[in-house]
From Swiss-Prot:
Record-level GO BP terms: tRNA splicing, via endonucleolytic cleavage and ligation
The keyword Heme is assigned to this record: no
Membership in a protein family: Belongs to the KptA/TPT1 family.
Protein's name in the database: Probable RNA 2'-phosphotransferase
Function: Removes the 2'-phosphate from RNA via an intermediate in which the phosphate is ADP-ribosylated by NAD followed by a presumed transesterification to release the RNA and generate ADP-ribose 1''-2''-cyclic phosphate (APPR>P). May function as an ADP-ribosylase.
Gene assigned in the entry: kptA
Keyword Transferase: yes
Keyword terms, alphabetized: NAD, Transferase
A Pfam family: PTS_2-RNA
Assigned EC number: 2.7.1.-
Stored SUPFAM superfamilies: ADP-ribosylation
One example GO MF annotation: tRNA 2'-phosphotransferase activity
Species of provenance: Pectobacterium carotovorum subsp. carotovorum (strain PC1)
Amino acid sequence: MSNTKHADVSKFLSYVLRHKPEAIGLTLNSGGWANIAELISCAAKDGRLLTREVIQSVVDNSDKKRFSISADGLSIRAAQGHSSAQVDMRYEPKVPPEFLYHGTATRFIDSINQQGLRPGSRQYVHLSADEATAITVGQRHGKPTVLKIKTLEMHQQGFIFYQADNGVWLTLTVPVPFIDSTPFID
């Protein structure tokens, strides 16, 4: 499969499995799982040709491990990033490392310095374990910058953290005092 086709299918899967399953008539269960046969059928009705092999290829070759296929091979879900309140991934709370990183665009820094980090349309704020990943995330929205987050200190003060199957760290919010005041700019 070409890189362009792979990217198109990945974006489509992200859209329907994270944000708008109803756009193609797909139903997710409360854990975010969709039946693969139903996904293929709904996609076909929407004019998109998906096969089990194409879906498996996208799952296997995703560097960010955005999707998971169930143990029985019948269902698929997005690892994290859901905007739908009906999806509850039931992550287990986890103690974070001392620091995690948040990639964003420099144009958002003033707002972040006033409000902290908020999930926006997602359920959680997403944090990365390393600066390189955070830079990649930040550059999707403009000139990237990386914020260093005092996550262990947050945890010690009662904030809850989760880690998605693909390694992305999640929390409900990051108040300003826990954000390193000097962002790293590439």
